[in-house]
UniProtKB/Swiss-Prot annotation:
PANTHER family: PHOTOSYSTEM I IRON-SULFUR CENTER (PTHR24960:SF79), PHOTOSYSTEM I IRON-SULFUR CENTER-RELATED (PTHR24960). Keywords: 4Fe-4S, Electron transport, Iron, Iron-sulfur, Metal-binding, Repeat, Transport. GO terms for biological process: tRNA wobble base modification. Its cofactor is [4Fe-4S] cluster. Ferredoxins are iron-sulfur proteins that transfer electrons in a wide variety of metabolic reactions. One of its GO terms (molecular function) is 4 iron, 4 sulfur cluster binding. [4Fe-4S] cluster 2 binds at residues 19, 38, 41, 50. It comes from Escherichia coli (strain K12). This is Ferredoxin YfhL.
Length: 86
């Protein structure tokens, strides 16, 4: 499941540089997460770094519109970072 940045976002710029998949970018009003790139940090870290660094609780949550299993997130990570070795 990809993550989603809610309207609680204060545009503090903490999450964007921490994303190892470059899935976070500035949207029209707040930061947004590209669900095609978000692996919830599977393959990189045990927990999503964007959630760790966000100063506002419950601002970055699981996106119910993009449900993925741990295996699907892993496969996405492998395709993005190790496709040349497949």
């Amino acid at each position: 499941m990809a993550l989603l940045i809610t309207k609680k976002c204060i545009n503090c710029d903490m999450c964007e540089p921490e994303c190892p998949n470059e899935a976070i970018s500035m949207g029209d009003h707040i930061y947004e997460i590209n669900s095609d790139k978000c692996t919830e940090c599977v393959g990189h870290y045990e927990t999503p770094t964007c959630q760790k660094v966000c100063p506002i609780p419950n601002t970055i949550v699981k996106d119910p519109a993009h449900v993925e299993t741990e295996e699907q997130l892993w496969d996405k990570f492998v395709l993005m970072h190790h496709a040349d070795k497949i």
